[in-house]
Amino acid sequence: MTTTDTASETKPFQAEVAELLNLMVHSVYSETDIFLRELISNASDALDKLRYESIATPALMEAGGAPKIQIVPRKAPDTLTVIDNGIGMNRQELIDNLGTIAKSGTKSFLTKLTEAKDGAGLIGQFGVGFYAAFMVADNIVVTSRRAGSGEVWTWSSSGGAGFEIAPASEEAAARVVRGTEIVLHLKPDAAKYLEAYQIERIVSEYSDNIQFPIELVPEEGEPRQINSASALWQRSKSELTEEDYNQAYKQIAGAFDEPAMTLHYRAEGRQSYAVLLFAPATKPFDLFEPERKGRIKLYVRRVFITADADLLPPYLRFLRGVIDSEDLPLNLSREMLQNNPQLAQIRKAVTGKVIGELESLADKKPEDFARIWEAFGPVLKEGLYEDYERREKLLALARFTTTAGEKRTLSQYVEAMKENQTEIYYLVGDSIERLKSNPKLESATARGIEVLLLTDGVDAFWTSGQLDFGGKPLKSLSQGDVNFDLIPKLDADKPDDKPDETKADEATVIAVIKDALGERVSDVKASQRLTSSASCLVAGGFGPDRELEKMLARANKGAATKPVLEINLGHPLVAALADAKADKADATDLSFLLLEQAQILDGELPEDPAAFAGRLNRLVLRGLVAHG
């Protein structure tokens, strides 16, 4: 054979690969079947790549025969071999593809895999399924010839600290005319995978819809095809069963569960294309990784083009599946993918179909939709500020936890609104428990006004878009003024907690606090939000909500503006400020205490914790809090 380097070389695995291999070699996962599913999936990808590259270079297909995958079990010795005549790999590609993991989110993946009771689904999701073969093999030998190349290389490893890369032997080079041969030397407890019925069972369950022939090569007799080798998405819905779709989902998504939603249709007209999409029932571990993109595969006339074409908007990135176009050109470059008007039309139409299917599911199968919302609601809500065209539909689909204690739609909220209530109230925070104890809810709760409790990271952003639903604007209880005067309290006959004569004089108290706090706050106001707490902090009437301001400040994307301090004129602490006996030092301590306890209730620390503790001690010792 011809090669530029005839010497073998031992190389260490990348640290992340070594960690992953350690998990595989000492695997306690029960779903060891996935190793074969993953090897077949990789072989199918290699055949897809060959078919795509041969469009520009037809000579690549001249040697090696028609595309296929072969599985060869041999009991003496105990080896299982998976062969494809796909694109193959050269020396550097073997090193890069089998010795490193060039993916974002690797650290998060390994952490979750370590913690998982059964990591099979995670392995498939992350696309590192080759290493799953070490669950059943104590040594793996990979021989590969890249299509059109004269060089053949062998990669081998026992799953330890490294691997060996060397020119293939003459015998191996003669076997591998094009593509890749993977020989697994099975562990004693994995001998069952040499049985034909076990191989057929796994192929039937996970790989039947691989669109290339999968052949079982017995020790005696002729190879026989053991899969249907059809593009399921090109078949009519009437031909397919729920089980067919479940198997296709497991193959496409690398999953073990069943899909929460399936969308399959063919579009005809100005453009013709087939669509098969699945919504998983569980959340992928890397859903919020910054580099994560959509997982929809683009085919053109059954030729795989790319899985990186942004075929759906980012807020639908949890979907898995296939779009197969009859009209797009086969030679699509990355630039053409980004700017192709036909692809933009497909994206728009498919997005509309997905939203329509979610609406139908929410109406006809609310329990199935609830599973999707539970897993992917925070992602779908990204569309509320990304997709103006479909914002109203997405708002109607959204489910919210409220002070009523249940998941509600905005339609249900509006139906239950109090007489004279004109706004949809919400509060953003980091947990339901903390929101329920937030003092800004007090006046609304006293009137039986339902409030949306929003705790997803995206909530502070989409709510900043001045949205309305059914003509009712969404109103934050952390921003601007609120007016509940036209909505009576639930116990309307009960007098206010404090009669007017016991309330502090508004002008006097506000002047004292402003003088003490100076520029630490933008304003001091009497509150309509509070009934029992002394104070709270809110944002001004213009600009971002207070929670969004805090988030942006934590991310160093701008300093939070000075908040408005609202005070409860009926609270003893506030009334103490109006006491003529209070000297300036006491008034300053009380003013700062109102600000600092509001900061604590808002999830922040006082600017100077030591000073806060000092003034609190002074006030307690003087008895001002108890007797003011």
Swiss-Prot record:
InterPro entries: HATPase_C_sf, HSP90_C, Hsp90_fam, Hsp90_N, Ribosomal_Su5_D2-typ_SF. One of its GO terms (molecular function) is unfolded protein binding. Its main location: cytoplasm. Residues 1-334 are annotated as: A. Residues 335-550 are annotated as: B. It is found in: Cytoplasm. Residues 551-628 are annotated as: C. The keyword Cytoplasm applies. It holds the Pfam family HATPase_c_3. The keyword DNA repair does not apply. Molecular chaperone. Has ATPase activity. Belongs to the heat shock protein 90 family. Homodimer. This is Chaperone protein HtpG. It comes from Rhodopseudomonas palustris (strain BisB5).
